[in-house]
């Protein structure tokens, strides 16, 4: 009986190899042959999963985005009794990729962003990842506003636009801090301070007692 191949698992394994190589030499330097060698599979196995290098890179971008999003959701689910404010703090911690164990992932993500700026095909999965995170931020900000006292800024968030604006601002800040830490302009601790200060301002505008966004 022929051996059954788990193509989902193989595609993820190949995506991990793509990420390692993209970290070492940038996405533009990744070849299907090198990926096969790094993933310890044949070139034919890679080609059966992905018809072209572009298709392989697209999947790798989606893979990284899904990994970050899943980690954010898992962090939130780990504390079901936590407030929306606490959950948002945990979410921003994960998205910023400031911890040392996420440094390689941060480099890979920014390498794909840089490549997407000159190669439109990679832009769509990146936009999808950012959209999913923005939607999550909108939901948590709206829930946090609802938990605050009635009237004032909190009421404005019930209509949606302000929550979207705040979510966009927070996502842009969180994402931008990743690059500042990678190039050494800020330390991870300094970046966390910037993020916590912004969240404190958000809680003040909402009239919500928010915790510091620490993991």
Report each predicted region and the residues it spans:
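Short Lys/Arg-rich basic patches
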Residues: 3-4
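Helix-turn-helix
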Residues: 13, 17-59
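Short helix-capping/turn signature of helix-turn-helix
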Residues: 50, 111-118
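Short, basic, alpha-helical segments at the C-terminal edge of helix-turn-helix-like DNA-binding modules
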Residues: 62-68
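Hydrophobic alpha-helical connector segments
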Residues: 73-106, 153-160, 166-170
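Secondary-structure edge/capping motif, primarily at the C-terminal ends of alpha-helices
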Residues: 79, 113-116, 181-185
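Amphipathic alpha-helical packing segments from all-alpha helical-bundle domains
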Residues: 101-110, 120-147, 165, 193
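Hydrophobic/aromatic-rich alpha-helical bundle segments in the mid-to-C-terminal region
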Residues: 123-127, 144-215
């Amino acid at each position: 009986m022929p051996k059954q191949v788990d193509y989902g698992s193989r595609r993820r394994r190949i995506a991990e190899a793509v990420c390692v190589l993209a970290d070492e030499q940038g996405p533009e330097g990744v070849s299907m042959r090198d990926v096969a060698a790094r993933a310890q599979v044949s070139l034919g196995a890679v080609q059966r999963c992905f018809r072209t290098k572009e298709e392989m890179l697209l999947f790798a971008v989606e893979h990284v985005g899904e990994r970050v999003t899943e980690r954010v959701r898992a962090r939130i689910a780990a504390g079901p009794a936590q407030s929306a404010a606490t959950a948002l703090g945990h979410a921003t911690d994960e998205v910023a990729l400031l911890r040392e164990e996420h440094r390689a992932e941060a480099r890979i993500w920014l390498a794909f962003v840089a490549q997407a700026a000159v190669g439109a095909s990679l832009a769509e999965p990146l936009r999808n990842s950012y959209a999913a995170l923005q939607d999550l931020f909108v939901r948590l900000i709206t829930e946090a506003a609802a938990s605050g006292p009635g009237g004032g800024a909190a009421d404005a968030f019930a209509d949606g636009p302000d929550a979207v604006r705040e979510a966009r601002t927070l996502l842009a800040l969180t994402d931008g801090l990743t690059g500042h830490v990678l190039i050494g302009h800020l330390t991870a601790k300094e970046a966390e301070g910037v993020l916590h200060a912004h969240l404190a301002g958000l809680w003040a505008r909402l009239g919500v007692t928010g915790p510091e966004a620490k993991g």
